[in-house]
Structures are given as structure tokens and as C-alpha cells.
């Protein structure tokens, strides 16, 4: 199973890099003028996802469920770096997970402010939009500090982890760098409050990010309903673009929700209930996230989809346009014949 996970990561990483590079080029050269600074947020998201994919391959991270605990493991046995570097990679990996939670809040918030005409966006014109990344960076810092402090390895944890590392990875605690949460002490079965409190903190941040995504998403949705009443050509085009971007954003936000946040939430719950959760499902689904996430924007936004088809298969696009014109002519002819028949 570990071999499958490594293979999947090595396959998903180049797909992620290629897909996100394509999306970045499409955003730079094929974005409608109405997108404004929103395109910089999308570029930032693509850069983050490429970095996540590369980190996943470099780290070879594994998540092990160990009844009352779980551990994030970065092996350094027979590799070009030692324990200290492996621990740094482990912390960065945890930070990237936290960053992903805050990132979609920022994008949904920007779309909400943009569609409702909030004047606050005028303060972030041009490259000032980069300051919006401070919010997901805050999430990343919290996850890193929690992993570095309360979730760092300690002697009691080593005793718990040692047999599982040997069985699952054929490694010892001296050949890996790991972070993990031990909810119950193995000595007297008492609660470890440092693990509980930091778990509550991370749960609150996770729940708040989900709440904000839903809140800003609903604001966008209800405002789009008002755009339906506008009938001039420019407003119709704007409405179509806004709908495409919103649908793409919803799909993009659903991908990490299904592949990352729900599995990790289940993992936390299983640890509290002393249930072993499939150790490879979490790391495997996380590896898929950066490869799948850019696809909705590429194929839902018309400008990007058409530009990609023009490059990959120009003849296919020509046939599509021909069929579209043929269908349009038939409808026009049918309407004309119907009107003539009624007039007679």
C-alpha cells in the first residue's frame, strides 16, 4: 500500500505542475478584462498547489493512524537529508495543510466583495492584493507552531509509535521525523490537555474557515440572482463570466473539502474514539488534491476552455463552431417558417 501511495504521488505531482502552469498561462493571456485583480489570487492559488505537489513527492509523507493517536511521518532513511531537515519538511507539510484552509476563504471573500461592489477592494489594487495572503498564512503559522510544540515527538510517544513504524514502514523512530497527537497518556490513561486544547484550536479554525466559505458563497449566489434582471449586452456577458467563475470556485473548494478536510476530520474523530483509521487514505487523497483542483477553472471558464481547445485541437473547435452555427441557422429557419405559416 505504501508503494501505491508513493507511485500515486509521483504521478499526481507532474500532472499538478502541468495543469497549474497551463492555468497560469491562461489566466495571464486569456483572462477577460472584467476579472481584474481576481486573477492574481488564482495565480497565487496555482503556485501554492504546484508547491504542495512538489513537497508531497520530496517529503514522501505518510499519515499513520495508531488507535489513540495519529502521526505525520517523513522518513529520512537512505535519503540525502537528515533528521533536522526531515522535521523541517514535516512542519512545512503541516503548514501547507493549514494554508489550504485559509486560501479558499480569501478567494470567496474577494468574489463576494467584487460582486457586491464593496469599495474596500479599491485599497488593494494592483500587487497590493498580495496582502490578502496574510490570512491563509496565519492558518499555516498556527499549524506549524502546533506541530512544532504540542505535537512534537517525546519519549512516551516514541514507545507508542515504534511498533507501528516497524510494521508499516519497516523503520525505527531514529529513521523518521514525525509529529503527532496523543490524546490519552499510555501510563495512566489520563487526558493530555495540550493535545486536546490544540485540537480544539485547530477544529475552531477549520470550522470558521468552512463557515466563512459558505457565508461569502451565499452572498455571491444571491447577488447573481439580481444580475439576471439586467438585459443589456454588457451586463449579460458580465453575468455569464461571474457565473462561470463562481461555479469554478465552488468546484475548486469542493475538491480539498472532500480530499483533505473530511478525511482528516474523520482521522481526528477516530483517534478520540480509539479506532484505527485506514492510514494511507488520508495521505493518498491529499496527494490528489493539487492535481485535480485546477481542472474546474480550466474547463468551466469559457475563455480558458476555448483557448485550450484552440491549442490542443483546432479542428475540433472548428467542427464545434460549425455545428453551433448549423443549429442556430436551423432554429432561425424554423422560427421564420412558423411565423410565415401563422401569418397565412
UniProtKB/Swiss-Prot annotation:
Entry keyword set: Cell membrane, G-protein coupled receptor, Glycoprotein, Membrane, Receptor, Transducer, Transmembrane, Transmembrane helix
Gene inactivation effect: Lack of sensitivity of ADL neurons to N,N-diethyl-meta-toluamide (DEET) with no effect on average pause length of worms following DEET exposure in contrast to wild-type worms which show a marked increase. Does not affect AWC neuron activity in response to DEET.
Location(s), subcellular: Cell membrane
Distribution of this protein across tissues and organs: Expressed in the ADL chemosensory neurons.
Extracellular side: 1-10, 61-88, 150-195, 278-279
An MF annotation (GO) of this entry: G protein-coupled olfactory receptor activity
Chief location category: membrane
Single GO BP term: olfactory behavior
Effect noted on mutating residue 314 to S: In LBV003; confers resistance to N,N-diethyl-meta-toluamide (DEET)
SUPFAM superfamilies: Family A G protein-coupled receptor-like
Record-level GO cellular component terms: plasma membrane
Pfam families the record matches: 7TM_GPCR_Str
Glycosylation: residue positions: 170
Residue numbers on the Cytoplasmic membrane side: 32-39, 110-128, 217-256, 301-344
TM stretches of this protein: 11-31, 40-60, 89-109, 129-149, 196-216, 257-277, 280-300
Entry superkingdom: Eukaryota
Topology versus the membrane: Multi-pass membrane protein
Any further remark recorded for this protein: Mediates sensitivity to N,N-diethyl-meta-toluamide (DEET), the most widely used insect repellent worldwide.
Function per UniProt: Probable G-protein coupled receptor.
Family from the record: Belongs to the nematode receptor-like protein str family.
Protein name: G-protein coupled receptor str-217
Organism: Caenorhabditis elegans
Gene that encodes the chain: str-217
Amino acid at each position: 500500500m505504501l508503494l501505491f501511495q508513493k507511485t500515486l504521488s509521483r504521478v499526481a505531482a507532474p500532472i499538478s505542475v502541468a495543469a497549474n502552469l497551463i492555468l497560469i498561462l491562461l489566466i495571464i493571456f486569456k483572462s477577460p478584462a472584467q476579472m481584474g485583480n481576481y486573477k492574481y489570487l488564482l495565480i497565487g492559488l496555482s503556485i501554492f498547489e504546484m508547491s504542495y505537489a512538489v513537497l508531497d513527492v520530496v517529503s514522501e509523507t505518510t499519515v499513520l493512524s495508531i488507535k489513540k493517536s495519529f502521526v505525520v511521518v517523513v522518513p529520512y532513511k537512505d535519503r540525502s537529508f537528515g533528521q533536522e531537515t526531515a522535521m523541517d519538511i514535516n512542519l512545512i507539510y503541516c503548514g501547507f495543510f493549514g494554508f489550504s484552509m485559509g486560501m479558499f476563504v480569501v478567494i470567496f471573500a474577494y468574489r463576494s466583495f467584487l460582486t457586491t461592489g464593496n469599495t474596500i477592494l479599491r485599497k488593494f489594487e494592483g500587487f497590493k492584493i498580495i496582502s490578502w495572503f496574510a490570512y491563509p498564512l496565519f492558518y499555516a503559522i498556527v499549524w506549524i507552531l502546533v506541530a512544532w510544540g504540542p505535537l512534537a515527538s517525546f519519549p512516551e510517544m516514541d514507545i507508542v509509535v515504534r511498533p507501528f513504524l516497524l510494521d508499516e514502514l519497516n523503520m525505527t523512530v531514529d529513521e523518521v521525523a514525525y509529529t503527532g497527537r496523543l490524546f490519552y497518556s499510555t501510563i495512566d490513561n489520563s487526558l493530555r490537555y495540550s493535545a486536546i486544547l490544540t485540537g480544539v484550536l485547530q477544529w475552531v479554525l477549520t470550522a470558521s474557515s468552512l463557515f466563512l466559505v459558505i457565508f461569502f458563497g451565499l452572498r455571491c449566489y444571491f447577488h447573481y440572482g439580481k444580475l439576471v434582471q439586467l438585459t443589456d449586452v454588457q451586463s449579460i456577458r458580465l453575468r455569464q463570466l461571474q457565473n462561470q467563475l463562481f461555479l469554478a470556485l465552488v468546484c475548486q473548494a469542493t475538491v480539498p473539502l472532500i480530499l483533505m478536510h473530511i478525511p482528516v476530520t474523520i482521522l481526528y474523530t477516530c483517534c478520540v474514539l480509539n479506532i484505527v483509521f485506514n492510514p494511507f487514505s488520508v495521505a493518498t487523497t491529499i496527494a490528489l488534491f493539487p492535481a485535480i483542483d485546477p481542472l474546474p477553472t480550466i474547463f468551466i471558464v469559457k475563455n480558458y476552455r476555448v483557448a485550450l481547445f484552440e491549442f490542443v485541437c483546432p479542428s475540433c473547435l472548428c467542427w464545434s463552431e460549425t455545428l453551433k452555427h448549423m443549429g442556430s441557422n436551423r432554429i432561425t429557419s424554423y422560427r421564420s417558417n412558423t411565423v410565415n405559416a401563422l401569418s397565412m
